[in-house]
């Protein structure tokens, strides 16, 4: 386990009684919980989630922008409060979410959360998939004759058109695993891991959610049906757009893993 507690004690003014424990995390970042009951002469206490981002050399995520975005999301009661980001952007601290449980990967639950996110009155930076794809291609050192590279190029015009559709341009989470949805006592969920959030096409977010949660065709259809019912969108029109974005999401996912694999090999 990384020895990051001394740095956190200084940055967050923690007491000598502060304790750190490692928690399950994703493929790139390490996650810790820091708890501090304070010293004998103070009643202050703290409970933080800490992400070590130093292993991420490939994603191209603008951490400072995402930090400010999460502060806005917290003000709307849908994300933990972002507290501190180190100058080198390798350490991210946010409030730990107490007394919670992870949501079940039910299509209806995920549809409701996505519908809520997509209606938030927040404007973030655009996803800009073409630029992101090119970044992954560069990191992965894909050759112009690589089948994945050619697949991405063949979708270029459709991706550009997708991101110019104002009717479907919304704030997207873009990484909505069921484990990123935490249930609270008031039944209003809080969502974590917003690092890939951006303004994008709602159907990219929907298709991404279905892919990473490994939903079946039937479950994906149920999610889309519930989502369109909530927002009053034509299901037939939504289904056609969803099918296109399933392919776009698949290419994005493959490029991401190619870039990750190359960065780990270096």
PLM ranges: what are they?
Residues 23-24, 28-127, 147:
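ATP-binding pocket architecture of kinase catalytic cores
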Residues 2-15, 122-174, 179, 184-186, ...:
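An alpha-helical support segment within catalytic cores of ATP-dependent transferases
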Residues 55, 99, 189, 197-199, ...:
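Activation segment
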Residues 203-233, 247-263:
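Active-site activation/catalytic loop segments of kinase-like enzymes and analogous catalytic loops
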Residues 240, 244-247:
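Start-of-helix signal in alpha-solenoid helical-repeat scaffolds, especially tetratricopeptide repeats
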Residues 14-22:
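Conserved N-terminal boundary motif of the eukaryotic protein kinase catalytic domain
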Residues 24-36, 41-49, 158-204:
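Active-site acidic catalytic loop and adjacent metal/ATP-binding pocket
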